[in-house]
Amino acid sequence: MKKIIEVVGAILENPNGDIFCAMRPKDKTFPGMWEFPGGKIEEGEEPKKALEREIKEELNIDIRADKVFDEVQKEYEEFIIKLSTYNCTVLDFSEFKLVEHQEFKWIKKESLMTLDWIPTDIPTVEKLIKL
């Protein structure tokens, strides 16, 4: 039986309605592909708290994970990813810096599919575009 890995992702939207997109590091799976920032839920951790922790670690910003926007399960050769993506509120962006990702962009919803997204995030991107 394949291992199920539970992960969380953040949908961060600026006042202009642009969505924060992050390019994965060269030394991780799916290098150079785009994703919603986030990460794995640690054992015993609440999903919202995991997301807030991951965003602090990866982007050095404070957020509040508000509500689940989408849930996706994607099977890969060796494991299954269960992704919960949350609408988030940025509480403090003043100390922002990329800690893990190669690059970031703020993109209009209708232009999101111009990026090369990791497979797990594509259903969420498609749902965002329809809003």
Segments predicted by a language model, with ranges:
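Unchanged
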Residues: 41-65, 72-124
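Residue-level signal for short segments within beta-strands and strand-turn junctions
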Residues: 12-14, 23, 90
